């Protein structure tokens, strides 16, 4: 029987009720964190002379044994509700209630689970950041390799202006940079301690909340006990960051799918990330990119579900909060898997430089620079130049002739003169790109500068990540060994 029910509640729980209410399926994510929390709390109880050193050391020794054998070695009886009671029941079985039953003094499962979630989530966030840094490094290498590879950029999915493929890759690096920063920002709000808040009103025991905060490597305390046990905003913030990252990554998937079609044919996805058809032998389908695109969409649903669960809950702890965790962990599983797949696809793509250049040379992608050249060389207003070049494009399309064959006549009709050299330069995609060397532009030298700038940022991210990981490792080493 559940050790919690024998007092106030006389009867045992029906089996279907047990299965309905247990959280053990996803408690695997907080198993080690719960043991860390137990050890830190017990250590503090001994130091405060609330629990004897003799009893406390026995509890800690047994907790370390449980950590080594793992969760699957325990009696995962759903009648025990959750991993907290599974571990406590195991301790009581080994040490007796007079010893093990003292571990929970001055604590509630409410502040315990709130602490466990933060301990586990901070590690997941760092795992995500590590994968993003690795992916960013691979993307920067690709961008540098293609700093001079001419391609065409799109607006409204219509050809717009020539750019470099390196510049296009850096657009995704730039988004990932912001994602990394968001996760680091969220980490500061995840890594705060609710331990000691009790059920919702702290405790009458002389506990030392700052001591457990230090033992567990938290930055600071959540001081208000009611907020401490009820706050799950750190989960919402993390899931929102994951959803935003998922949206950014879905753009990469979409570009891989689109640009690998025969109509674009500018990139080819490696065979290991594709499939073929059961009936059409010629097919090379971008299955991994498509599945990633779909999986990334589920992140938004998980976020909205959690927000809906939390909306208008009475203050402090409610069991509804238990149903948040599965959606949180599912989102972390999904984003981690998708980062790995997308990094693999981007790192192994074949780039068709000839096709990219061919696309950039047709369909009037250089029209903007032609208008700009008129402004610079003929000293006319841009809006006037815009109209003249627009007329030139329309005439070219309607009469099915090349711009170069009619350009002089159109300019002459508008009282303008431009040398052949200037015209050829304006219509050359590479010359177009070279001119756009302002900060953030697609010019090769600006792409190379941006790559170095992003690498410097990446080094700072790596240092920040390593510092945080070492801090967590030190906590685990201190408490578990």
UniProtKB/Swiss-Prot annotation:
InterPro entries with a match to the protein in the record: Arg_succ_lyase_C (IPR029419), Argininosuccinate_lyase (IPR009049), Fumarase/histidase_N (IPR024083), Fumarate_lyase_fam (IPR000362), Fumarate_lyase_N (IPR022761), L-Aspartase-like (IPR008948)
Functional pathway: Amino-acid biosynthesis; L-arginine biosynthesis; L-arginine from L-ornithine and carbamoyl phosphate: step 3/3
A cellular component annotation (GO) from this entry: cytosol
Keyword ATP-binding: no
SUPFAM superfamilies tied to this protein: L-aspartase-like
Main enzyme class: lyase
GO molecular function terms listed in the Swiss-Prot or TrEMBL record: argininosuccinate lyase activity
UniProt key word Hydrolase: no
Keywords for the protein's UniProt record, in alphabetical order: Amino-acid biosynthesis, Arginine biosynthesis, Cytoplasm, Lyase
Family the UniProt entry places it in: Belongs to the lyase 1 family. Argininosuccinate lyase subfamily.
NCBIfam families membership: argH
Name recorded for this polypeptide: Argininosuccinate lyase
Organism: Methanococcus vannielii (strain ATCC 35089 / DSM 1224 / JCM 13029 / OCM 148 / SB)
């Amino acid at each position: 029987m559940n050790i919690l029910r024998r007092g106030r509640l006389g009867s045992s729980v029906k089996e279907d009720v047990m299965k309905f209410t247990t959280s053990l399926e996803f408690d695997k994510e907080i198993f080690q964190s719960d043991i860390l929390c137990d050890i830190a709390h017990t250590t503090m109880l001994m130091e405060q002379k609330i629990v004897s050193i003799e009893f406390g050391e026995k509890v800690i020794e047994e907790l370390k044994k449980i950590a080594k054998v793992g969760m699957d070695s325990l009696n995962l009886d759903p009648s025990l509700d959750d991993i907290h009671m599974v571990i406590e029941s195991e301790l009581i079985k080994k040490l007796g209630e007079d010893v093990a039953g003292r571990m929970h003094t001055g604590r509630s499962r409410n502040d315990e689970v709130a602490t466990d979630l933060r301990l586990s989530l901070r590690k997941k966030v760092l795992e995500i950041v590590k994968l993003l840094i690795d992916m960013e490094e691979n993307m920067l290498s690709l961008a540098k390799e293609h700093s001079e590879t001419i391609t065409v950029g799109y607006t409204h999915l219509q050809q717009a202006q020539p750019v470099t493929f390196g510049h296009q890759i850096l657009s995704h690096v730039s988004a990932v940079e912001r994602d990394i920063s968001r996760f680091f920002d969220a980490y500061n709000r995840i890594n705060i301690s609710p331990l000691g808040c009790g059920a919702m009103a702290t405790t009458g025991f002389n506990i030392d909340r700052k001591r457990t905060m230090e033992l567990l490597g938290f930055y600071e305390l959540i001081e208000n006990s009611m907020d401490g046990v009820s706050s799950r905003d750190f989960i919402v913030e993390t899931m929102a960051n994951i959803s935003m990252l998922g949206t950014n990554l879905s753009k990469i998937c979409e570009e891989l799918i689109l640009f690998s079609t025969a109509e674009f044919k500018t990139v080819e996805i490696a065979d290991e990330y594709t499939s073929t058809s059961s009936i059409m032998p010629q097919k090379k389908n971008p299955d991994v990119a498509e599945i990633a695109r779909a999986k990334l969409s589920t992140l938004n649903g998980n976020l909205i579900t959690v927000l809906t669960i939390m909306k208008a809950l009475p203050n402090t702890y409610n069991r509804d909060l238990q149903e948040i965790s599965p959606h949180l962990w599912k989102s972390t599983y999904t984003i981690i898997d998708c980062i790995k797949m997308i990094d693999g696809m981007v790192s192994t793509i074949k780039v068709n430089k000839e096709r990219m250049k061919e696309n950039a040379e047709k369909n009037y992608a250089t029209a903007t620079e032609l208008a700009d050249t008129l402004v610079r060389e003929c000293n006319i207003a841009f809006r006037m130049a815009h109209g003249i070049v627009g007329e030139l494009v329309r005439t070219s399309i309607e009469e099915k002739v090349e711009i170069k064959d009619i350009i002089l006549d159109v300019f002459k009709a508008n009282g303008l003169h431009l040398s052949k050299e200037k015209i050829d330069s304006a219509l050359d995609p590479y010359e177009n790109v070279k001119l756009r060397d302002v900060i953030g532009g697609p010019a090769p030298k600006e792409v190379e500068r941006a790559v170095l700038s992003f690498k410097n940022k990446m080094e700072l991210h790596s240092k920040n990540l390593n510092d945080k990981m070492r801090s967590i490792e030190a906590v685990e080493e201190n408490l578990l060994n």
